[in-house]
Amino acid sequence: VVMEVSSQGLMLHRVSGFVFDYGIFTNLSPDHIGPNEHASFEEYQECKSLLFRQCKEGIVNADDEHVDGIIKNHTCKLHTFSCKKDADLMAGAVGYLDEEGQIGMHFTTTGCMNVYAVVHIPGSFSVYNSLVTMLTCHLAGISDEAILRGLDKVKVRGRVELVPVSKDFTVIIDYAHNEVSTRSVLTTLKEYHPKRLICVYGGGGNRSKLRRYDM
């Protein structure tokens, strides 16, 4: 079972009866803060950190500025991934894949896996997502060959999802619903040097109105 465990779920003890084999941390930004969520960023971070007190092994992004707060008081064995510093799994030689009808990333890894990898989802965040997936699968005993085959085929609906409409332009759908994720997607797409970039977005979901102003 692969389960997304929210900060609110941890705060409200919805998963207190579980001991997870692996707990994963990718990144943290000021989000989920408001009257119906967390009172402050500090509370949000503390609730996120609870995951690493109820899992056997933790897998964390060594490049995230909040990682020390997340692993504070951890009780699990830790594994790290990074694009910038020494870690159990590191990415290097990162490049942009831009072929007819598809865009993505390619990179090499060192550490517990020494491979060349391709993922057909654009952006540096896709490299980080690939690293954490590769590291988790490696720790679970899955072969490098199977990991690379899966990575080459993976697509996520609503995450920088290419929609075939016309040869004259490219349409991409993304779930970005706050300032940080919207900025990340637009920055990513700019790296492919389009002639023009048009963004149409909404602010639904009954979330904090502050999100709309930030976006």
What do these predicted ranges mean?
Residues 1-73, 182-183, 207:
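Flexible active-site lid/hinge loop adjacent to a nucleotide/diphosphate
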Residues 3-33, 71-116, 156-163:
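Extended acidic/charged loop-beta regions that coordinate divalent cations
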Residues 3-6, 27-28, 61-63, 81-84, ...:
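Fold-independent oxyanion-binding glycine-rich loops
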Residues 4, 26, 44, 59, ...:
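Residue-level signal for inorganic ion chemistry
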Residues 21, 57, 77, 143, ...:
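Residues at the starts of beta-strands that form the adenosine-phosphate
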Residues 47, 54, 73-81, 189-192:
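P-loop/Walker A phosphate-binding loop and immediately adjacent motor/lid segment at beta-alpha junctions
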Residues 107, 111-215:
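Nucleotide phosphate-binding/pyrophosphate-handling subdomain across enzymes
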